[in-house]
């Protein structure tokens, strides 16, 4: 940092960071979460200390950290596996890229969602089922993952040499990196609450001298309204 003015690292998604930090502390992000608890404040302070000391940053107006990484103003960042294409584009062969699993036991799984709605006709439901069956075959999952950067949902695809040898930096480590995945509970208000956590953390980390306790108290009140 002192020699090259390069920030150590950061997280693309602050809500992902916050939720995953709490999960590894044994706390689930749901309606029972108390944002003013010691573990919640610890999660915020960990990132805030890094920002203050210059070894962490947030994406901010860059939206994603792949661009700063490509411009060599940040040494590493935690983001979606689907960002590999953007990272390669930003780096443009200027330096060697390396990848590694998330640095914690519990890892959040997020991605593209496909649903079959109850309001659909019988014919539409059958068509949706046939499409999902088609999309989730081993061969199609390899093609889909290669083209999108998302993780295959079928283990046979993940463990296949064909997938591992696609040229993706992530493909060879996916099997080990996805051993302990978790998702947020599917409850009413979850999406709004999750997005609000990103807004709150960004407001804290973007300020020079934030009142963390006050902002977390306000976050608690907002969550209570969301969960109602």
Describe each region flagged by the PLM.
Residues 28-29, 53, 119-128, 203:
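Short helix-loop capping/hinge motifs at secondary-structure junctions, enriched
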Residues 93, 146-203:
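Long, aromatic- and glycine/proline-rich binding clefts that accommodate carbohydrate-like moieties
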Residues 1-3, 83-90, 224:
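Pocket-flanking alpha-helical
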Residues 57-70:
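Short helix-initiation/N-cap motifs at beta->coil->alpha
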Residues 75-80:
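Paired acidic/hydrophobic, glycine-rich loop segments that form the ligand-binding mouth/hinge
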Residues 1, 31-59:
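Glycine-centered hinge/linker elements that transmit conformational signals in sensory
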